[in-house]
C-alpha cells in the first residue's frame, strides 16, 4: 500500500513577469535643532518691535532681547522678575504632516532684569509649543504670530517691565482678541505649557452648558478614556498612512497581475 505524502506534491512553477527596476533618490532636510527653532521668522520681529518701543520709553537705558527655550516658570535668578502672557494668539505648523491650526491659548514666558547702576537690562522670552493632534507625533511645533499681535504683546511686556523693574505705575495692559473667552476646548495633553503645570485655560460658561447638554442626551464616556482625549488618536488620512495604503494596493495589483499571466 502506497502512503500518500502531501508535502511531496510538486506545484507548477509560476513565472512572474520581470519589471524594470528603478531607484528614487531623495534627500530629506535635516531636522532642525533647538537653536534653529529659536531663529524663526518672528524672532526678528520680536526684537525689532521691542527695541523700537524701548527706545521711545527708556532711551537712556540699553536692553537686550534673548530667546531662551529653557526658561522655567517661577524659576528665577536673584534680581530677576517674571511676566507671563497666558492668552496669545498664534498659528502652528506641523513639521511632519503639514497640518496647521490656530490657537488663542499660546503661553509666553518673560524673565526681566535691570542693572540700575549700569543702566542696562535683559529680557528673556520663551514661547511654549504645542503638539499636532492630527498625526500624533511627539515633536513639538512652535508658533508664528502676526506683527500686530506681537506689538500688543510687547506693549504688555513693557508695561510689566516698567512696573516691576522701574517701580512705575499707571500702565495699561492691552486686551487683544486672543485674551477673550474662547468657546473651543483647549487640549491640554497637546500643550507644552499645560504639561509643565501652567494653568492658563478654563472653559467658558457657554461651553460648560453645551457639554452638560451633550452629557445629558448622550452616553457617558468610558472611564478608561477621558472625554478630553476624544479625537486625539491616530489619523489614518495623514500622509504616512496614505503612503502605506498605496503600497498595499500596489502590492495587491502586482500579485493579481502575476497570477493571471502565469495561468
Swiss-Prot record:
* Subcellular location per the Swiss-Prot or TrEMBL entry: Cell membrane
Transmembrane ranges? 239-259
Q: What is its main location?
A: membrane
The record's SMART domains line, in alphabetical order, gives: zf-3CxxC
One GO process term, biological-process aspect = protein insertion into membrane
The way this protein sits in the membrane is described as:
Single-pass type III membrane protein
The terms under GO molecular function for this entry are: olfactory receptor binding; zinc ion binding
Q: For side Cytoplasmic, which residue ranges? A: 1-238
Which family, according to UniProt?
Answer: Belongs to the TMEM7 family.
The molecule here is called: Receptor-transporting protein 1
Upper lineage: Eukaryota, Metazoa, Chordata, Craniata, Vertebrata
Amino acid at each position: 500500500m502506497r502512503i500518500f505524502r502531501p508535502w511531496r506534491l510538486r506545484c507548477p512553477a509560476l513565472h512572474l513577469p520581470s519589471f524594470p527596476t528603478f531607484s528614487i533618490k531623495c534627500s530629506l532636510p535635516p531636522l532642525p535643532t533647538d537653536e534653529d527653532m529659536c531663529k524663526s521668522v518672528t524672532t526678528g520681529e520680536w526684537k525689532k518691535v521691542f527695541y523700537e518701543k524701548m527706545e521711545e520709553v527708556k532711551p537712556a537705558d540699553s536692553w537686550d532681547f534673548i530667546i531662551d527655550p529653557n526658561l522655567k516658570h517661577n524659576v528665577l535668578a536673584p534680581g530677576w522678575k517674571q511676566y507671563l502672557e497666558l492668552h496669545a494668539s498664534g498659528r502652528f505648523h506641523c513639521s511632519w504632516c503639514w497640518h496647521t491650526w490656530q490657537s488663542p491659548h499660546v503661553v509666553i514666558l518673560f524673565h526681566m532684569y535691570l542693572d540700575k547702576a549700569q543702566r542696562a537690562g535683559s529680557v528673556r522670552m520663551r514661547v511654549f509649543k504645542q503638539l499636532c493632534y492630527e498625526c500624533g507625533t511627539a515633536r513639538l511645533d512652535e508658533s508664528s504670530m502676526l506683527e500686530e499681535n506681537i506689538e500688543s504683546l510687547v506693549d504688555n511686556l513693557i508695561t510689566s517691565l516698567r512696573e516691576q523693574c522701574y517701580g512705575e505705575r499707571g500702565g495699561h495692559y492691552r486686551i487683544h482678541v486672543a485674551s477673550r473667552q474662547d468657546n473651543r476646548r483647549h487640549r491640554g495633553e497637546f500643550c507644552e505649557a499645560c504639561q509643565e503645570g501652567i494653568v492658563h485655560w478654563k472653559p467658558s460658561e457657554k461651553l460648560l452648558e453645551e457639554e452638560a447638554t451633550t452629557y445629558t442626551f448622550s452616553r457617558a464616556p468610558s472611564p478608561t478614556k477621558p472625554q478630553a482625549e476624544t479625537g486625539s488618536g491616530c489619523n489614518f488620512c495623514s500622509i504616512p498612512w496614505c503612503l502605506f495604503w498605496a503600497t498595499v494596493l500596489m502590492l495587491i495589483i502586482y500579485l493579481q497581475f502575476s497570477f493571471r499571466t502565469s495561468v
